[in-house]
């Protein structure tokens, strides 16, 4: 029987963080590094918990090289070959602790991932990525991967509700990806009518995960460094970004010149572009749930990284958090009708 949940759910655009008294004298005093010990793998990881999404335009080896210099993380897209991985591992061994191998839930995906992890044993993270993390098949796949790789840290998703976060953690996942439809090039919500506002999803899923000593990634909906800060404030352990890292030198694809403007292609992994590239086209039984856009070329990603990290440090000083770990404890969200002054855009 159809039912309506009348509780209002909120997104990042619906709130601001209230400033609070602080003893910090400078943004430079803020520690953005986190150390986690994961529930099922028992592995420990230290770094700044911002992740480049495993999309084939941004989740590249070139991106991982720069991100690892800042102790940040990259979920490498699943379309690199075994030889590509071997070459990367040989030339950039210092990056391997800050990357994940990505996989879908098919048998071919599992076989390819297994070969990569056997060839590059220094990689300890697995990112199991499907559009709909609610299927029984996916839960069974997570259990299978856990049985085959008992000491690897498994990221799995995507879901947006607490009961499914708990199910995946109890099935062997360590970190749950939270977000259905909020991405900048995702059209799931308009094609299917399915989704969940990201701020509320993160708050609710973090509560469920942390009760089981699990962790979550807020995946999608961030448009600016302030949104990244709100995701951490809402309880996310990691924040995954795609659109904010698009358009850079380190992204896949050539720079396009059109009408004197430099551009780079960025597309969702369920878009026509991605499915034609990797699956020979859109299957007749499904619809494209992503868009393809031309993003203004932004140059090297280093400047964007510094902008995001600088914004996070500033957020922490405004709310009195000396460490990123403290941000969620110091966060009070206020509902708003406007985010900023729009006189000049």
From Swiss-Prot:
An example GO CC term for this entry is: GMP reductase complex
Binding residues annotated for K(+), in chain numbering: 181, 183, 186, 189
**Where are the Phosphoserine residues found in this chain?**
28
Q: Name one GO biological process term.
A: purine nucleobase metabolic process
| PROSITE patterns attached to this UniProt entry | IMP_DH_GMP_RED (PS00487)
Q: Name one GO molecular function term.
A: metal ion binding
Similarity field: Belongs to the IMPDH/GMPR family. GuaC type 1 subfamily.
Name the chain's protein.
Answer: GMP reductase 1
Organism, as annotated: Rattus norvegicus
């Amino acid at each position: 029987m159809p039912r309506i949940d009348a509780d209002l759910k909120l997104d990042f655009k619906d709130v601001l963080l209230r400033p609070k008294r602080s003893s910090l004298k400078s943004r430079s005093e803020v520690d953005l590094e986190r150390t986690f010990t994961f529930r099922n793998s028992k592995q420990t990881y230290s770094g700044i918990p911002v992740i480049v999404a495993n999309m084939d335009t941004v989740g590249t080896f070139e991106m991982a090289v720069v991100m690892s210099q800042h102790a940040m993380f990259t979920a490498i897209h699943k379309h690199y070959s075994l030889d590509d991985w071997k070459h990367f591992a040989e030339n950039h061994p210092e990056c391997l602790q800050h990357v994940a191998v990505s996989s879908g839930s098919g048998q071919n995906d599992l076989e390819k991932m297994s070969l990569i992890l056997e060839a590059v044993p220094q990689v300890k993270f697995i990112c199991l990525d499907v559009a709909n993390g609610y299927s029984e098949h996916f839960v069974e796949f997570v259990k299978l991967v856990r049985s085959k790789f008992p000491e690897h840290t498994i990221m799995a998703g995507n879901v947006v509700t607490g009961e499914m976060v708990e199910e995946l953690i109890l099935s062997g996942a360590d970190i749950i990806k939270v977000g259905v439809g909020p991405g900048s090039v995702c059209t799931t919500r308009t094609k299917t009518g399915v989704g969940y506002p990201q701020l509320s999803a993160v708050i609710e899923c973090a509560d469920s995960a942390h009760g089981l000593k699990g962790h979550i990634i807020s995946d999608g909906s961030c448009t600016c460094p302030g949104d990244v800060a709100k995701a951490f404030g809402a309880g996310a352990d990691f924040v995954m970004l795609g659109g904010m890292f698009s358009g850079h030198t380190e992204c896949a694809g050539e720079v396009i010149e059109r009408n004197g403007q430099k551009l780079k292609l960025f597309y969702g992994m369920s878009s026509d572009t991605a499915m034609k590239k990797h699956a020979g086209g859109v299957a007749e039984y499904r619809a494209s749930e992503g868009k393809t856009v031309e993003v203004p070329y932004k140059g090297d990603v280093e400047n964007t990284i510094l902008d995001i990290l600088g914004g996070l440090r500033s957020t922490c000083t405004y709310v009195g958090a000396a460490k990123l770990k403290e941000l969620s404890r110091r966060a009070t969200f206020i509902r708003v009708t406007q985010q900023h002054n729009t006189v000049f855009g």
